[in-house]
Regions:
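Ordered, amphipathic secondary-structure segments that act as subunit-interaction surfaces
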Residues: 37-99
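Residue-level signal for functionally critical sites in structured catalytic/ligand-binding pockets
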Residues: 30, 60-74, 105-113, 141, ...
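N-terminal interaction modules that seed assembly of large macromolecular complexes
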Residues: 4-61
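Short, surface-exposed beta-edge/turn micro-motifs
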Residues: 2-4, 25, 88-92
């Protein structure tokens, strides 16, 4: 199954309209919960792998992406940390399979919105020393993402 990721600025602040695009195969998330495009690719790949191999925590691949991005086992916590809300201005997205909708209706693509510089360490990784080198901080976050399946329940 093909995985496509992207990011950009929201064109609307109509939360209902934005959420109407979300489906089991399309995740739209707050870009501040993504520590670089590699992190988004990693979460998408792990989500697909978990569903293909029967160790998924969520019934939908799109929700599973949020769990991996935030290294959470509880959907409600993952949604509060990375879900789109009234204050979200920039988003990342993951599509599994052929995209059947046109996100350009609600998103202006801009690759710069997802970066380690925009990652919300204060909300998602308070214990990471922000004075560390950016590559090291990203490795820490991506390691936490990778070990989610082996964490005790």
């Amino acid at each position: 199954m093909k995985i496509t990721v992207g990011c950009g600025h929201l064109k609307t602040d109509d939360l209902d309209q934005i959420l109407s695009f979300v489906s089991p195969n399309l995740a739209i998330l707050d870009s501040r919960s993504v520590c670089g495009i590699e992190h988004l690719h990693q979460a998408a790949t792990l989500s697909l792998s978990s569903h293909n191999n029967g160790f998924n925590l969520s019934k939908d691949k799109s929700t599973e992406v949020l769990l991996y991005l935030t290294f959470q086992r509880q959907i409600s916590k993952a949604l509060s940390l990375s879900g789109v809300n009234k204050t979200t201005k920039n988003v990342g997205w993951v599509s599994f399979g052929k995209a059947s909708i046109d996100l350009s209706e609600i998103i202006t693509e801009d690759d710069s919105v997802i970066s380690i510089h925009n990652y919300d360490f204060s909300k998602l990784a308070k214990d990471v020393d922000i004075s560390l080198d950016n590559d090291l901080k990203q490795k820490i976050i991506m390691t936490r993402t990778a070990v989610l399946p082996v964490q005790p329940r």
